[in-house]
């Protein structure tokens, strides 16, 4: 999807299910999916064949599926691949929205493919889709302070100062996803980066 596409797209917000994870850094993808759902005025329903919460919408006439896997982050690949197969969405039209340790807090970046950077949700998706050639909306959460284990850091809530900024960052990430869907990767990167 370098230029705008007309086929169906699958937008996947990554996170962990359960109230104990709701406000953690690792769940920022779920927050973006929720904002996109609000914007199209719809609610998620369980898609039993995939094991994901799903809503179907139209953006400028294009079918857009917005999903939140109901599995834990490390097992996200199975529901993503099931949705892509069920709705005939090629991996190149899958957009995964996720937290990114390697970006400063609040940065939003778009890219296609590349490594997983230790992100087990991405690793699971790459394995299930049998390719890394899918789109990513990366939301910077920064690095853990001191010697804190990154695995612990991503499962902690945002710090008090960060919490005030999260709603704005989530809106910016949702804007980036919509722009990507409208104009394609290259044009969206040129506008955002």
UniProtKB/Swiss-Prot annotation:
One of its GO terms (biological process) is rescue of stalled ribosome. The record marks 99 as: Stabilizes the basic form of H active site to accept a proton. It catalyses: an N-acyl-L-alpha-aminoacyl-tRNA + H2O = an N-acyl-L-amino acid + a tRNA + H(+). GO terms for molecular function: peptidyl-tRNA hydrolase activity; tRNA binding. It is an enzyme of class 3 (hydrolase). GO terms for cellular component: cytoplasm. Pfam families: Pept_tRNA_hydro. TRNA binds at residues 21, 72, 74, 120. The record marks 16 as: Discriminates between blocked and unblocked aminoacyl-tRNA. Its EC number is 3.1.1.29. InterPro entries: Pept_tRNA_hydro, Pept_tRNA_hydro_CS, Pept_tRNA_hydro_sf. Gene3D superfamilies: Peptidyl-tRNA hydrolase. Its main location: cytoplasm. It is found in: Cytoplasm. Belongs to the PTH family. Monomer. Hydrolyzes ribosome-free peptidyl-tRNAs (with 1 or more amino acids incorporated), which drop off the ribosome during protein synthesis, or as a result of ribosome stalling. This is Peptidyl-tRNA hydrolase. It comes from Nocardia farcinica (strain IFM 10152).
